[in-house]
Amino acid sequence: MSVLTPREIVSELDKYIIGQEQAKRMVAVALRNRWRRQQLEPAIRDEVAPKNIIMMGPTGVGKTEIARRLARLSSSPFLKVEATKFTEVGYVGRDVESMIRDLMEISVNLVREEERDSVKTRAEAAAEERLLDLLLPSSPAVNTSFDTPQTPAGGAENTRNKLRTLWREGRLDHREVEMEVEMQSGPQMDVMTMPGMEDIGSQFKDMFSKAFPPKRKRRRMKVGDAYAILLQEESERLIDHEKVIELARERAEQTGIIFLDEIDKIASSQQGGKTADISREGVQRDLLPIVEGSAVNTKYGIIHTDHILFIGAGAFHYSKPSDLIPELQGRFPLRVELTALGSKEFLRILTEPKNALTVQYKALLATEGVQIEYTEDALEAVADFAQEANQETENIGARRLYTIMEKILADLSFEAPDKSGERIVIDREYVRQHLADITANRDLTRYIL
């Protein structure tokens, strides 16, 4: 659980997300409240429920990124789902409980990876010893003189140490070894199930996998490939899988975050027909018990959703949060509106974040030996073009920068292998030249940018 203060959380989010201070502060408090809840006595701890949030704002303003970065800060299981994928139970589509099963699967993988890291040193040592066992019999150095009783043992040990040194220096990568590997046995079955019965399908697949256990077969492979397989086997052997499931269940229940995107699409609206409104309301009513707190059966056991944090997000162009059914509105007490981005914000997005687009393209082209530099006026021009395109066509927020940067650097990316060793300056004129044919034609702007 993160012990960062709200101010520190906002500071971390500022490294990746520009603007939206109100939304950052709200999610920072929500995350800190989770830590505060863990400090309470058990009697009152169970009574404190998370305050779910609805983020309102056009696409490309940072709604998803805020939630994703928040989950990474707290090492929490995070699931992003589209609310429009769910349908009422009994209709074709996914049932709402599947999101909890998916969250638990993510939590198990997260904890398993952490456990694998914790046993990494021991697993590497064990895998190295097994690899040396495979290498030593095939080593000609083992066939040394047998004049004295001590020589074979001493010679074998010296050879083993030499092989160990050669392996660590990467000088055995060209060698091949023969070893047993698991081969999938039996039919590969995909069990088709009705909505709401995915867990039964999973149990059937587990049953068939036990009925057809994997067989082992001898194969020749490169030393590096053999070591990777041995490392995985040793890691799995050292991990306590029951402990992994127990920790994953606790983390999913206590720190899980589910991001419900496009939640505005399941709200009733003035423009929707009667049938569409009934269908949307049905999905909302199916969501209600999950958000309120219920027990969901998964292949890892029962998962209680009482303390999972739900963050709903949507543009709300044709509907508003008050169009949701009253019971669901009450389960999302916090509302925050994210503001549309302009050229000033676009310029900051291009320069300030650690993972800025400009940094990404610079690193990509550097792999070809091409060094690119951006002038300040070039980035200002990109920001202005992005704002202009958003105003004249659909407003897709910061995602417009991806399209524009790709267009500007398209020729350079294609010719990069032929320009190795060159230094290229991207200035305002360079930007104008590569966007001139599009910006001059409004119709092209609509379709390309």
Swiss-Prot record:
A Pfam match: AAA_2
One GO cellular component, as annotated: HslUV protease complex
The organism's place on the tree of life at top rank: Bacteria
Keywords noted in UniProt: ATP-binding, Chaperone, Cytoplasm, Nucleotide-binding, Stress response
List of residues binding ATP: I18, G60, V61, G62, K63, T64, E65, D261, E327, R399
MF annotations from Gene Ontology: ATP binding; ATP hydrolysis activity; peptidase activity; proteasome-activating activity
Record-linked CDD domains: RecA-like_HslU
Compartmental location: Cytoplasm
GO terms classed as biological process: protein unfolding; proteolysis involved in protein catabolic process
InterPro entries: AAA+_ATPase, ATP-dep_Clp_protease_ClpX, ATPase_AAA_core, Clp_ATPase_C, HslU, P-loop_NTPase
Subunit comment: A double ring-shaped homohexamer of HslV is capped on each side by a ring-shaped HslU homohexamer. The assembly of the HslU/HslV complex is dependent on binding of ATP.
Function: ATPase subunit of a proteasome-like degradation complex; this subunit has chaperone activity. The binding of ATP and its subsequent hydrolysis by HslU are essential for unfolding of protein substrates subsequently hydrolyzed by HslV. HslU recognizes the N-terminal part of its protein substrates and unfolds these before they are guided to HslV for hydrolysis.
Family: Belongs to the ClpX chaperone family. HslU subfamily.
PANTHER family: ATP-DEPENDENT CLP PROTEASE ATP-BINDING SUBUNIT CLPX-LIKE, MITOCHONDRIAL-RELATED, ATP-DEPENDENT PROTEASE ATPASE SUBUNIT HSLU
Protein name per Swiss-Prot or TrEMBL: ATP-dependent protease ATPase subunit HslU
Gene coding for it: hslU
